[in-house]
From Swiss-Prot:
Superkingdom of this protein's organism: Bacteria
Record's compositionally biased regions (Low complexity): 218-227, 253-276
Ranges of compositional bias, category Basic and acidic residues: 228-243
GO process terms (BP): translation
Assigned protein family: Belongs to the universal ribosomal protein uS3 family.
Classification via InterPro entries: KH_dom, KH_dom-like_a/b, KH_dom_type_2, KH_sf_prok-type, Ribosomal_S3_C_sf, Ribosomal_uS3_bac-typ, Ribosomal_uS3_C, Ribosomal_uS3_CS
Protein name: Small ribosomal subunit protein uS3
Assembly notes: Part of the 30S ribosomal subunit. Forms a tight complex with proteins S10 and S14.
Known role: Binds the lower part of the 30S subunit head. Binds mRNA in the 70S ribosome, positioning it for translation.
Amino acid sequence: MGQKVNPHGFRLGITTDHVSHWFADSTKSGQRYKDFVREDIRIRQLMSTGMERAGIAKVEIERTRDRVRVDIHTARPGIVIGRRGAEADRIRGELEKLTGKQVQLNILEVKNPEMEAQLVAQGVAEQLTSRVAFRRAMKKAMQSAQRAGAKGIRIACSGRLGGAEMSRSEFYREGRVPLHTLRANIDYGFYEAKTTFGRIGVKVWIYKGDVTAKELAAQAASAPSRGPRSDRGGRPGGADRGDRRRRNDRPAADAAPAAEAPAVEAAPAAAEGGQA
């Protein structure tokens, strides 16, 4: 299972989080769930078109009623911002035209790009496009990631490697990459290299270490909760279980004198029979 499924989706809610944060329950056109999903796809396509040199690792989207917040995680924030913020203003204008809402654009710098799987995959793909030998590109990327502190890395390339007539897949691995361990913090990235022989897919898995119980507790504490639950003891009738139990005991106590009453009345009758 861990060998096939996407590592991000497999660990969703454990070590990874959603990249889109919004809720849709409307039936109006343009505000339905499928409309928001389609809009998110277009936003990410807009970020990837013409921004290859910026090194965008991830795009996070958060929606409110009248605003859309877009967080761009990039290794080269200067390219995204542009001179005097001209490029950022252009991107914000296109996003507002696409969504029809006010857009808050945040550009965040990636501190360690050698540890970001998406950026590593993009770097290998760019080297393949430049006709660098695929084995050399893969080994160079693995060495850089290990020097940056990765505990394990795996890179796979699929396609017409080296211009061969028949396509094949090759991968290299250094260190540990436990894909089936849910507590393992594994980053995954995919990118396609467009070469003269066709497209070559590049997949990268980077193992950054296990998530400790302390970090899991911190994530659980920061997660939104459903709020305080209502007191189960409170009943609509105004009485809890203890009161109901005591209320049920009262008829039994009241029934005891009623049961003794016929015996008291029968005593004089028996006495009259003895006199007769």
